[in-house]
A protein has these predicted regions:
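ATP/NTP phosphate-donor binding region
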Residues: 1-85, 95, 134
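Catalytic core of DAGKc-family lipid kinases
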Residues: 33, 43, 64, 103-107, ...
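Glycine-rich beta-strand-to-loop/alpha-helix junction loops that act as flexible
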Residues: 36, 88-90, 111-114
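Short N-terminal binding/cap micro-motifs at the start of the first secondary-structure element
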Residues: 39-43, 231, 327-329
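Short Gly/Thr/Asp-enriched flexible loops that form oxyanion-binding sites at enzyme active sites
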Residues: 93-106
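Glycine-rich phosphate/pyrophosphate-binding beta-alpha loops
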Residues: 163, 167, 223-242, 311
């Protein structure tokens, strides 16, 4: 059990009766890493989830205490031989867990606790916590880990997407108001996107140069994806780049050349549409089947960078690569 605290096997007074917990012959060891500050996580839900999963798994649970803590916990869990680590939080918690488990035999699973839960949805995990917990319980009888790729930017792994420019500036603004992010979810992201564009990208935004193989593109925003979609607006997938899947062994990207007040509404409509394609817009170029991408400032101004919806700071250069089959997952 190491330094992790064994969850107490007691039924909460309001535990839902529809969690069916039967005892298998041998329980797998599970570490649940909980982000107590995630948008939809509470002490009550934490205890209910732990109680339910104890029926099929030998459960330890630990809360994260600071940025990067989940990465440390996952490295230790892999070293101690846990059969699975469950990240209970948002995409930032999942990202840290993936960075800690990369290259190890210990698989990662997710329980939705954030505002978007993009990677969990990409893996096919139900968006509702009760359904996701029952899904995880059912997997105890059908345990089939599989390997997925990880993208890398400046040494930091990401599970689904990363970006520089407008995309990252929106993430920076949203992260600065966590209470509104938790309360308003995708609607706060939409407001932040419009207001950030008007304040920082309508006039003279920072320019960047994107180099992928023999192609060099100039733009004001670049996104790089390890899979599709780029994100979700509630349950609606937002498609930007094309061609990447979690096990394709390659990345996909898109470059926005100019962010004009005429072009941006049409690009936004294409992103939300189930039929139109963002890459068909004349201000957007796509990058497909790429293994390495370098994005650098073209005018000396630093570029905001995000990975999996977490703001990583401003950089002069971002180097992207792919780690094929680097992460074990169960879903």
């Amino acid at each position: 059990m190491g330094v992790f605290t064994r969850a107490q096997n007691r039924r909460p007074s309001d535990a839902p009766v529809h969690f069916q917990a039967t005892s298998p012959r041998a329980k797998r060891r599970m570490l649940i890493i909980v982000n107590p500050y995630a948008a939809t996580v509470s002490d009550r839900l934490r205890h209910l989830v732990v109680y339910a999963l104890q029926g099929r798994f030998e459960v330890d649970a630990v809360d994260t205490e600071a940025r990067g803590h989940a990465t440390e916990l996952c490295r230790q869990a892999a070293h101690e031989g846990y059969d699975v680590v469950v990240a209970f939080g948002g995409d930032g918690t999942v990202n840290e867990a993936a960075n800690g488990l990369r290259g190890s035999a210990t698989p990662l699973c997710c329980l939705p606790g954030g505002s978007a839960n993009v990677f969990a949805k990409m893996l096919g995990i139900p968006a509702e916590l009760v359904d996701a917990t029952e899904h995880l319980l059912a997997m105890a009888d059908d345990w089939r880990p599989r390997k997925v790729d990880l993208g890398v930017v400046n040494g930091r792994c990401f599970t689904f997407s990363s970006g520089l420019g407008l995309d990252a500036s929106v993430v920076e603004r949203v992260d600065s108001r966590p209470s509104l992010k938790a309360r308003l979810g995708p609607y706060f992201f939409a407001w932040a996107a419009v207001s950030t564009f008007l304040r920082r990208y309508l006039v003279s935004p920072a320019r960047m140069e994107v180099q992928a193989g023999e192609r060099t593109l100039l733009g004001v925003t670049a996104v790089v994806q390890n899979g599709s979609p780029f994100t979700y607006f509630q349950d609606r997938p937002i498609e930007i780049a094309e061609g990447a899947t979690l096990d394709s062994g390659a990345l996909a990207g898109a470059v926005l050349h100019r962010a004009t007040p005429v072009a941006m509404p049409f690009i936004g409509w294409r992103a939300l549409s189930r039929h139109a394609r963002v890459l068909r817009h004349r201000q957007v170029s796509g990058l497909m089947d790429i293994r390495e991408v370098t994005v650098r400032t073209a005018d000396g101004r630093p570029l905001p960078l995000q990975a999996d919806g977490d703001y990583l700071g401003d950089v002069a250069e971002a180097r992207y690569s792919i780690l094929p089959r680097a992460l074990n997952v169960v879903a």
